């Protein structure tokens, strides 16, 4: 790892981030980072333990003169989203993140950076290690598996935490203070299909959709970005309708909370239609590229011939699945009527897999209104059940209802305005912060979320602003010294 990362200011923050990013920490595979964090806490002589689900808690007493302040919980999640470009050779299970400086940004070579939520975790580590930063009594809460199920937050029991104020460090714009967030639910459709013999006189093709930006399926869902699964399905729908295309297999998207950037489909077409099919596809490709020319300038759609496969998908099942995906809502479903520019409800068709007689379609539906969340989830369920799929609604977690009378909110607003000569944006976000879940068992805890500027989270374009990290660090230090008295 380049020494240039460790030389960035504030060094305490960037050095801890570099230490953390040397440890592989995929969601649901956090064993190494859990041990890393426990060893870190123990090495400082601080009370360190894990709960039943393996969240790590480290307690640090108040510094002299701060004993009369309310105890705080500083919270971040240990896992990170693992995404890489198709041509990047990298093993997230064994390798640390390869970071570099690009102007005002810290990036990773061909992969996600892990600033979500690594910079938040590194902040807490730096505070725990410090000897000269005034602060009240701190409980550091490092949760597991935030990115693929909110498992740590959902299974944290009441009575473990003693703090009265929670500072969540998982917001990704430094001029925002978050006081609310969306809940979510996974919608997973599955079914089997029979494989049929390839008709005589067929030609094989591989269709590849790539070059899309991808991004966070909550925070970026309103940016007009392309969804590789929906684009691929549009191509398949047209070719099936006009030329009788048959699907061999599809592999689209990866993670439920990332807007899919790539999809690959193997198909066959009758040789007698091949020339007309290619001509028609090129026209549709040109149309799609024109539609996305502003938001997706690097979109690439390629069709190349391949060896003829042995089997193809059952035509009846294929038609149903293609039509269901076409009908399934993707993107913003409803904007909030209560907060300007806030997405209320959305869906991301994250994963489409067709292979070896098995179909899987995975969606993540989000909403800040619980009833609207289930309304859209049931609409999706209905579309897929109509074509013979079994549909599971799972992993539901609640949103976080804003408290505009929060005491800690007033503290943060005053500090931000004093430091930056402007008011912060007090917002709710269309993402799954853990605050809403934690508030279920700790309803009296005063919660707030903020953080440094991070762009492109959940994609290989993820980057963290160096100047923003400096601004954010000063903000954190001032907050710690101004926590309200008990």
Q: What do these predicted regions represent?
A:
Residues 3-105:
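Acidic/His- and Gly-rich active-site-bordering loop/insert found
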Residues 78-80, 141-149, 171-174, 213, ...:
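Acidic, glycine-rich active-site loops and adjacent beta-strand->loop/helix elements
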Residues 104-107, 147-148, 154-366:
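Midchain, well-structured core segments that form catalytic/ion-binding scaffolds
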């Amino acid at each position: 790892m380049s020494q240039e990362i460790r030389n960035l200011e504030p060094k305490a923050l960037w050095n801890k981030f570099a230490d953390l990013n040397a440890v592989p920490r995929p969601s649901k595979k956090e064993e190494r980072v859990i041990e890393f964090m426990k060893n870190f806490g123990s090495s400082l002589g601080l009370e360190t333990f894990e709960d039943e689900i393996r969240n790590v808690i480290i307690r640090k007493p108040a510094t002299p003169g701060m004993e009369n302040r309310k105890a705080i919980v500083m919270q971040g999640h240990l896992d990170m989203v693992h995404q890489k470009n198709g041509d990047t050779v990298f093993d997230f299970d064994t390798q640390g993140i390869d970071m570099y400086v690009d102007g005002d940004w810290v990036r990773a070579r061909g992969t996600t950076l892990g600033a979500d939520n690594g910079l938040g975790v590194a902040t807490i580590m730096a505070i725990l290690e410090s000897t000269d930063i005034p602060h009240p009594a701190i409980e550091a809460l490092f949760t597991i598996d935030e990115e693929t199920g909110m498992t740590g937050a959902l299974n944290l029991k009441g009575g473990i935490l003693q703090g009265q104020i929670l500072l969540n460090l998982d917001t990704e714009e430094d001029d925002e203070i978050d006081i609310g967030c969306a809940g979510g639910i996974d919608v997973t459709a599955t079914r089997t299909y029979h494989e049929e013999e390839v008709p005589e006189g067929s030609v094989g093709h591989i269709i590849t959709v790539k070059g899309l930006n991808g991004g966070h399926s909550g925070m970026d869902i309103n940016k007009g970005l392309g969804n590789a699964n929906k684009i691929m399905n549009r191509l398949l729908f047209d070719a099936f309708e006009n030329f009788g295309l048959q699907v061999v297999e599809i592999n689209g998207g990866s993670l439920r909370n990332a807007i899919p950037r790539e999809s690959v489909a193997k198909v066959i077409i009758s040789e007698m239609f091949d020339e007309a099919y290619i001509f028609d596809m090129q026209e549709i490709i040109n149309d799609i590229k024109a539609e996305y020319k502003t938001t997706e300038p690097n979109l690439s759609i390629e069709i190349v011939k391949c060896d003829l496969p042995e089997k193809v998908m059952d035509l009846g099942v294929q038609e149903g699945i293609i039509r269901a995906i076409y009908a399934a809502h993707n993107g913003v479903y409803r904007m909030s009527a209560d907060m300007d520019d806030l997405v209320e409800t959305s869906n991301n068709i994250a994963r489409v897999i067709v292979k070896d007689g098995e179909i899987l379609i995975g969606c993540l539906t989000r909403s800040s209104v619980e009833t609207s969340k289930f309304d859209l989830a049931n609409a999706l369920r209905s579309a897929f059940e109509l074509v013979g799929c079994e549909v599971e609604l799972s992993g539901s977690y609640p949103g976080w209802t804003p408290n505009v009378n929060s005491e800690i909110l007033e503290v943060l607003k005053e500090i931000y305005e004093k430091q930056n000569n402007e008011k912060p944006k007090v917002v709710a976000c269309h993402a799954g912060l853990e605050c809403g879940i934690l508030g279920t068992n700790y309803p009296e805890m005063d919660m707030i979320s903020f953080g440094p500027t991070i762009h492109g989270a959940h994609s290989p374009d993820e980057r963290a602003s160096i100047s923003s990290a400096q601004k954010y660090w000063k903000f954190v230090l001032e907050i710690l010294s101004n926590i309200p008295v008990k």
